[in-house]
């Protein structure tokens, strides 16, 4: 059994050192003549990308947390996570896989002796994406000391986010076609220009994320990237995604629904798509299997098992067949998001641009991404959809949230940052007072294996509770 904990990885050199007095022949005996002593960067990069795609769309991060808490899906059986009834062990695999599998592999690529700076830059960019996911889910996290100390200190989220801005710029600057090809890249197939665009697009995302806390820094970065928009993801063909193949390397949603049937599309999402006469509805959801139900029906969030059962499992909509295909992609960044960021930046006066134009482009890009963009103008002309500057946050919030379907943790982050859409807790929530989760618990292993740094983190950030706001999640947003 593979133990995926950072401390095991970090203790290996200590264990090896302790046995250096043993006969050198022992090492020779234990060598596998058919094994690769130093895994190749191409293999490690492929593994890190595949594991990240599984992690991003998988069980503990997605089905039992972000997909429910952002109200894209709802539970109809085993409803505890949908009622926020989770424990400090619920997110251990999110933490462990993020650090000891994905980031560990990327560190190995970056630290390899291969004389190819592009490999190191791509690894740095993908590692930055992983750190961004981790800090947005947990808050303060080990960052600057990770893999350098057995018990790494936690960096404040502010320092993590600003550190990632710098790392991504450094990586983008070092990517050059003359540095060599990048094999094993399952996202952009070694295309250096695409990786530069992805790096700068991530910087744009982070800049907006910190805008409520450090407006000067955020505004400068957003304005600079707006002036150099050609350096960003500029079409759906440039989206960052990972295309799965077939079993056993298949899309996690397809895998889950092949053996279980305890999730449905949320009533929150389906009702909003109906309100908007949204052509993405038959892409996002299926008609219920009960032939007597002729319209799409969502499941309510936050119900007890008995309450959920009373809705009728076969009277509710499963996720759309597009998302349940073996080879459905994991999507990490889209052209739609770029446009919504600039729409918000224009509405807030950060850039001198037409917020309505970027809002419309964001919606159109999402419709086209899912193959239903032919009647975009008609959709945009509806009173319920047409841009209203006095309601910019609400409108951008809803449309961006819809476009994030399949990117649950990103939707969860943006909802906390922007304050829209206005989601409501279900009747069986264990949090009380209508509260909603705003972060993940730290894994229980942090308390036992890295206790002093864990305590320092919660002393700085606040209690290790689901309702504790992270640094970027300002309470009084004044939208």
Give, region by region, the residue ranges found by the protein language model.
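Bacterial N-terminal signal peptides that target proteins for export
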Residues: 1-10
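Membrane-proximal, proline-rich intrinsically disordered regions
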Residues: 22-72, 76-77, 82-85, 89, ...
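Bacterial Sec-type N-terminal signal peptides, specifically the leucine/valine-rich hydrophobic h-region
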Residues: 16-19
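Structured, solvent-exposed acidic/aromatic patches
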Residues: 38-42, 73-372, 389-393, 478
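Long, intrinsically disordered, low-complexity segments
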Residues: 250-277, 281-285, 292-297, 382-479
């Amino acid at each position: 059994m593979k133990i995926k904990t950072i401390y095991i990885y970090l203790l290996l050199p200590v264990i090896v050192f302790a046995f250096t007095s043993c006969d050198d022949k022992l090492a020779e005996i234990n060598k596998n003549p058919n094994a690769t002593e130093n895994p190749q960067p191409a293999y490690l990069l492929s593994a890190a990308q595949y594991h990240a795609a599984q992690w991003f769309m998988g069980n503990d991060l997605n089905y039992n947390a972000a997909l429910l808490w952002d109200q894209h899906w709802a539970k109809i059986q085993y409803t505890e996570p949908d009622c926020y009834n989770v424990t400090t062990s619920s997110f251990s695999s999110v933490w462990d896989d993020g650090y000891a599998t994905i980031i560990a592999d990327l560190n190995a690529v970056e630290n390899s002796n291969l004389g190819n700076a592009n490999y190191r830059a791509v690894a740095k960019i993908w590692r930055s994406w992983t750190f961004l996911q981790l800090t947005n889910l947990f808050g303060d996290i080990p960052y600057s000391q990770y893999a350098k100390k057995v018990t790494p200190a936690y960096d404040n989220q502010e320092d993590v986010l600003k550190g990632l801005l710098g790392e991504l710029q450094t990586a983008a600057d070092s990517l050059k076609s003359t540095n060599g090809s990048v094999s094993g890249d399952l996202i952009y197939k070694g295309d250096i220009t695409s990786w530069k665009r992805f790096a700068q697009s991530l910087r744009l995302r982070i800049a907006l994320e910190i805008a409520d806390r450090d407006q000067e820094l955020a505004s400068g970065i957003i304005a600079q990237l707006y002036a150099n928009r050609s350096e960003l993801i500029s079409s759906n063909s440039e989206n960052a995604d990972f295309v799965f193949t077939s079993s056993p390397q298949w899309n996690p949603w397809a895998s889950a629904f092949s053996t279980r049937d305890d999730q449905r599309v949320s009533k929150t999402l389906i009702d909003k798509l109906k309100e908007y006469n949204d052509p993405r509805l038959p892409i996002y959801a299926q008609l219920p299997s009960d032939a007597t139900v002729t319209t799409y029906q969502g499941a309510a969030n936050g119900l007890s098992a008995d309450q959920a059962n009373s809705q009728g499992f076969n009277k509710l909509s499963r996720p759309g067949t597009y998302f349940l295909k073996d080879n459905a992609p994991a999507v990490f960044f889209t052209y739609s998001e770029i446009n919504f960021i600039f729409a918000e930046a224009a509405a807030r006066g950060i850039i001198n641009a037409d917020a309505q134009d970027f809002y419309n482009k964001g919606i159109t890009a999402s419709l086209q991404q899912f193959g239903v963009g032919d009647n975009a103008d008609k959709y945009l002309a509806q009173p319920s959809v047409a841009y209203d500057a006095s309601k910019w946050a609400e409108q951008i919030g809803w449309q961006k949230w819809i476009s994030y379907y399949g990117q649950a943790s990103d939707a969860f982050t943006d909802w906390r940052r922007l304050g829209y859409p206005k989601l409501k807790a279900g009747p069986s929530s264990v949090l009380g007072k209508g509260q909603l989760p705003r972060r993940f618990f730290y894994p229980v292993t942090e308390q036992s294996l890295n206790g002093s740094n864990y305590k320092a983190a919660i002393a700085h950030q606040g209690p290790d509770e689901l309702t504790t706001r992270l640094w970027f999640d300002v309470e009084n947003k004044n939208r």
